[in-house]
A protein has these predicted regions:
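Compositionally biased, intrinsically disordered low-complexity segments enriched in Pro/Arg/Gln/His
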Residues: 3-4, 14
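Positively charged, small/polar-rich N-terminal and surface patches that mediate targeting and assembly
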Residues: 17-140
Length: 140
């Protein structure tokens, strides 16, 4: 298929996917990892940064991504609440989940914090290795 006059031709055929030609050695996939992504929410950016920094200091997570402006609608104490929150995506390993749960009891500002752990089945090998290294018990 070609574009109108004045534009370069665009091929819709798939590229040659030969591994030695296409893949960056840092982009190899790691299957069946022990990595997890933990979801939680807090009320504002200040609470989010405070929580993530403390979890990083304790090596309970390798990374915390803050997604400001999330809107949560939920039932709480018999009423429907509609709140702006900050969603946190916490990258860690399943081996750190018990310690992370204990830290949530101590540090999380909510009475009933969201703590949902999602298994990461597949990820870039270097990234998975990085998560493991940053949350290693031997480094605490």
């Amino acid at each position: 298929m070609t574009r109108p006059t004045g534009h370069a031709s665009v091929s819709r055929d798939p590229p040659d996917l030969a591994p030695d030609r296409f893949l960056n050695p840092n982009c190899q996939l790691h299957m069946h990892t022990d990595a997890i992504v933990v979801l939680t929410t807090v009320a504002n950016d200040d609470e989010a940064v405070t929580l993530v920094r403390e979890l990083l200091d304790r090596r309970l997570i390798a990374c915390g991504t803050l997604v400001s402006g999330a809107r949560s609608l939920y039932r709480w104490q018999g009423k429907i609440a509609d709140e702006r929150e900050v969603l946190l995506l916490l990258k860690t390993r399943s081996a750190r989940l018990d310690a992370l749960q204990e830290a949530f009891r101590e540090l999380h500002p909510y009475k009933v914090p969201e703590l949902l752990a999602l298994s990461v089945d597949t990820g870039l090998e270097k990234y998975i290795e990085w998560i493991s290294g940053e949350t290693s018990l031997s480094l605490t």
